[in-house]
Amino acid sequence: KKNLNEKSLIRPMSKYGKTKLLCEKYFKHKLKKTKIKCCIGRVFSFTHSSQSLDFLVPALKNKIKKKTKTLELNNLNHYRDFISIFDLCRAIIFLSKIKFNGTINIASGKSIYLKNIAKKLNKSAKKKLKFNDNKVPTYLLADIKKLKRLGFKHKYNFFNTI
């Protein structure tokens, strides 16, 4: 349950995470040979209305729209660090304006239980939710001390933006 800081050992769980890490390593390797300064933002979870159904929130919204009284949801007993899309954009602009050079976590620093996202999205639909949990919950939470030290302040609550 340790928060991941910029120096933490990274062990991606998905193919997507592995490709992000490969890109980061590639850029760091290439930039070592130059005087080009670069900001590598490690963006944790976020959502937006244009995301595909491969992402959690759009997939849940799509399931809730279906004409069933009971929704069976699998594998949601996990904790993730979601940042509001508005704060994500603000953080990127902030880092650009201060010309930040290096690697930095861009996240909320808050743990969100995935079941709570499903419950929030289901509030108006009022469907019965049946959760089928996997055995071991997982935690993925960013340490954002570095971002805060630079002066960035979050303005938006993730749950108010979904």
Give the positions of each predicted feature.
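Nucleotide phosphate-binding site architecture
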Residues: I10, T47, L71
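The catalytic Tyr-centered alpha-helix of NAD(P)H-dependent dehydrogenases
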Residues: P12-T19, S49, L53-V57, D81-I85, ...
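Residue-level recognition of beta-strand->loop/alpha-helix junctions
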Residues: R42-S45, D133
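Conserved sequence/active-site signature of Rossmann-fold short-chain dehydrogenase/reductase
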Residues: C39, F46-S49, H78, L88
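Catalytic helix-loop patch of NAD(P)-dependent Rossmann-fold dehydrogenases
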Residues: K1-I40, Q51-S52
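C-terminal substrate-binding subdomain of Rossmann-fold SDR/epimerase-dehydratase oxidoreductases
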Residues: I64-I162
